[in-house]
A protein has these predicted regions:
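Anion-binding (especially nucleotide phosphate/pyrophosphate-binding) glycine-rich loop
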Residues: 1-60
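Structural signature of FAD isoalloxazine-binding scaffolds in flavoprotein oxidoreductases
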Residues: 1-17, 65-95, 109-116
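Short, low-complexity, polar/charged sequence segments that are solvent-exposed and flexible
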Residues: 10, 27-31, 46-50, 69-73, ...
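Glycine-rich loops and low-complexity Gly/Arg-rich segments
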Residues: 13-18, 36, 53-56, 76-79, ...
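N-terminal short leaders/motifs
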Residues: 33-40, 63, 68-70, 106
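Short, well-ordered alpha-helical segments in soluble proteins
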Residues: 42, 60, 64-68, 83-86, ...
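A gly/ser-rich beta-alpha-beta helix-loop segment of oxidoreductase catalytic cores
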Residues: 44-45, 49-80, 150, 156
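Phosphate/pyrophosphate- and phosphate-bearing ligand-binding catalytic cores of soluble enzymes
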Residues: 85-173
């Protein structure tokens, strides 16, 4: 037991690692699905709007928790609803319109365990979607180390104070 952490760690795995197409523009994803895997599934089904996920390391559940995003897109832009369990064990579905999203956070209780989510894409051209994913990957490679293991981004951009990205502010200091 870890005496430094007063809580429970839950790892959702195999049973929460499924993706399915509900109809021509809606995807349902388990919370353990890797963000990039969801973007590739959307590509195979000619759905645009998920391209940015190809550049985000992490899972769907984590992405929803922090409203992860990059290149001007965030989870809130594609989320229809999230299915969760509250601390009493009740399963609930929360429509995205009932969630207050902000930069890298939302107002959902930290006690919720996200199980799955539904997302809406837009029918698109496979080649254009793939090209956009490639373009975003190249842009990320120019601005971030992608060939070595890192802890990822540890800073939030101070959007209320400046238009500059935090890495630029650090470099300039």
């Amino acid at each position: 037991p870890d005496k430094l952490f007063d809580g429970v760690v839950i790892k959702l795995s195999k049973n929460f690692n499924n993706i399915s197409l509900l109809n021509e523009d809606i995807i349902i994803s388990g919370s353990a699905v890797i963000d990039k895997t969801l973007s590739e599934f959307a590509l195979k089904n000619n759905l645009s709007g998920f391209e940015f996920l190809s550049c985000i390391p992490g899972t769907i559940g984590g992405g929803i928790r922090m409203n992860a995003g990059c290149f001007g897109r965030e989870f809130k832009d594609i989320l229809i609803s999230v299915q969760a369990i509250d601390k009493s064990g009740n399963m609930i579905t929360i429509p995205s319109k009932d969630i207050k999203f902000e930069y890298r956070k939302n107002d959902l209780s930290g006690d919720f365990i996200f199980l799955s989510a539904s997302f809406r894409g837009k029918k698109g051209d496979y080649a254009k979607i793939k090209n956009e994913m490639h373009k975003l990957k190249k842009e990320k490679e120019i601005n971030q180390p992608t060939k070595i293991k890192t802890s990822g981004s540890t800073f939030k951009n101070p959007i209320s104070q400046t238009e500059k990205k935090v890495w630029k502010l650090i470099k300039e200091s």
